[in-house]
Design a protein with these regions (language model features):
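Long, low-complexity or tandemly repetitive, helically biased scaffold regions used
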Residues: 1-105
């Protein structure tokens, strides 16, 4: 398997895990609204994973994706995982606004 495909798949796994961390952080914040150190970390984790997925997907050859199922699939899963990480980060932003919290590094 090509290195670029492996990178895209690894980035997708990381983004999916980051999205799960964001969901867990939101659930924690519903119970304990002062636990923003976890929410902040999950937000930045999602953004970093999103960027990694986008970069890995961009590194794949679009012409090769037309004929190589591995490349096509890697591009697809990286794109979907990037979007999920983005969506979960946005959910944390919405919660932060609702609770009058500023997400910090």
């Amino acid at each position: 398997m090509k290195l670029e495909v492996r990178k895209a798949r690894a980035a997708a796994v990381a983004a999916n895990l980051a999205a799960q961390a964001a969901v867990a952080a939101r659930e924690l914040l519903e119970e304990e609204p002062s636990a923003w150190e976890v929410g902040d970390a999950a937000y930045w984790l999602c953004r970093a994973a999103q960027k990694a997925c986008e970069s890995a997907a961009d590194a794949l050859d679009p012409e090769e994706a037309e004929t190589n199922a591995d490349v096509f699939t890697a591009h697809l899963i990286a794109g979907r995982a990037a979007q999920e990480a983005c969506d979960q980060a946005d959910e944390l932003v919405s919660l932060a606004e609702e609770l009058n919290h500023e997400i910090r590094r």
